[in-house]
Amino acid sequence: MKRTFQPKNLIRKRRHGFRSRMATRAGRKILNRRRSLGCNKLCA
């Protein structure tokens, strides 16, 4: 059976990257929350 995690940087960026977060209202909410928590890394 194939493992579920097959790492690919492009897919990682497209799904969880900064621009995909900024594209939706919910994504911007995530970024604001992570900023308020003081996360150094906001996205993938």
From Swiss-Prot:
The keyword Ribosomal protein applies. Pfam families: Ribosomal_L34. GO terms for cellular component: ribonucleoprotein complex; ribosome. GO terms for molecular function: structural constituent of ribosome. Keywords: Ribonucleoprotein, Ribosomal protein. InterPro entries: Ribosomal_bL34, Ribosomal_bL34_CS. Disulfide bonds: none annotated. One of its GO terms (biological process) is translation. NCBIfam families: rpmH_bact (TIGR01030). This is Large ribosomal subunit protein bL34. It comes from Wolbachia sp. subsp. Drosophila simulans (strain wRi). The lineage of its organism: Bacteria, Pseudomonadati, Pseudomonadota, Alphaproteobacteria, Rickettsiales. The gene is rpmH.
